[in-house]
Regions:
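A short local loop/turn or secondary-structure capping micro-motif enriched for an aromatic residue
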Residues: 65-67, 158, 263-266
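Intrinsically disordered, low-complexity sequence elements enriched in Ser/Thr/Gly/Pro
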Residues: 14, 188-189, 265
Length: 344
């Protein structure tokens, strides 16, 4: 702006969203610069279970009723001395179940975040490619076809027709047991622009594989992300069996936890960024309260607490949305301007 050029430096820019975004980034940098690392140690025990070939790796927990953080090497050495030559035995076994719900279909903001994390797309690139997919792709025999719905939306609402089509597709291709019991909604109580529904494929039968030959590599990757997320949003939760074991060593306790997926649900189609498709599926089935345990070794490692992470495009978009600053459609140009002007 001319005023900013006159008062500070020519070529600078400011704006309601841009200025707040820069303040958020600057505050985070101050936090990082002021951060003082704190030392702590972890301790693992490799434990042989009689009758089992593979040893367990148990993590130090603390005492029977209290979790302990090991702050120094001196504390570590005292604990290691106390657990070196004592009997190890199973103190407690807890079995249970947990579920993980399917994600909601994409809004503009969540698409930008996930594309940044999964595809390493800048927000501006995500919006540019989404615009291409919305405006239309030349598909042989069909002409120019828009393959996704409008890309600027705050809503996770899905039309009844699209919801029914997705459920029918899931039932036919995965089985009725994979179809979600109820439509997923998360708009209640939020200020949203609901003129447009969530970002979704315009036709669920137009699978990524079916249109791949008509798309560029980046168009295909983004379309596949949108298609999978939408289908997953209409599917049942994933279900897991869990086992948690507490192992006693004198006054101290070590823990081992494992989970096994027993019903894939939506994860047969989609896993979010940061997830692993296969979790630890060893259910510790050979372990019971009478199992004979032998400690094979103790392994310790020094760590230091880490400062808050620098903002990425994905985390900055998430923060702006959570604070209610700007609209998702403004995030891409705002972040592009911040980067282009080398403010960060």
């Amino acid at each position: 702006s001319p005023l900013l050029w006159a008062k500070v430096k020519r070529g600078l820019s400011a704006g309601r969203v841009q200025s707040v975004a820069l303040r958020i980034i600057a505050d985070r940098e101050e936090e990082i610069n002021a951060f003082i690392p704190e030392e702590y140690w972890t301790l693992d025990a490799k434990i042989k279970v009689e009758g089992e070939r593979k040893p367990l790796l148990a993590k130090f927990y603390g005492t029977d009723g209290k979790k302990i953080v090991i702050h120094s090497k001196e504390e570590l050495e005292q604990i290691m001395k106390a657990v070196e030559d004592v009997p190890y035995y199973v103190d407690d076994i807890k079995k249970g179940e947990r579920t993980k719900k399917a994600p909601l279909p994409f809004t503009t903001s969540t698409l930008q975040q996930e594309a940044s994390k999964v595809l390493n797309f800048a927000t501006q690139k995500t919006m540019r490619i989404a615009q291409q997919l919305y405006e239309g792709i030349d598909i042989k025999g069909n002409g120019t076809v828009g393959v996704i719905t409008y890309l600027r939306t705050d809503s996770t609402r899905i039309s009844e027709e699209a919801d029914a089509n997705a459920r029918e597709y899931i039932s036919q291709n995965y089985g009725e047991s994979y179809v979600s019991a109820v439509a997923k909604k998360a708009d209640d109580g939020k200020k949203i622009q609901d003129a447009h529904e969530a970002i979704r494929p315009t036709d669920v039968t137009r699978t990524p594989a079916a249109v791949k030959e008509f798309l560029s590599r980046d168009q295909f990757r983004l379309y596949q992300l949108v298609w999978k997320r939408f289908i997953a949003s209409r599917m049942q939760p994933a279900r897991y069996e869990t086992t948690s074991v507490k192992i006693a060593a004198g006054q101290y306790r070590f823990t081992v936890a494992a989970s096994k997926i027993v019903f894939e649900g939506f994860r047969s189609v989609y896993t979010e960024a940061g997830e692993t498709k296969e979790e630890n599926n060893v259910l510790l089935k050979g372990l019971d309260m009478d199992s004979v345990l032998t400690k094979e070794s103790l392994n310790s490692k020094q760590h230091f607490t880490q400062p808050p992470a620098h903002y990425t495009e994905a985390t900055l978009v998430k923060t702006l949305e959570e604070l209610g600053i700007g609209r998702p459609s403004t995030y891409a140009p705002t972040i592009s301007t911040i980067i282009a002007r080398r403010y960060v």
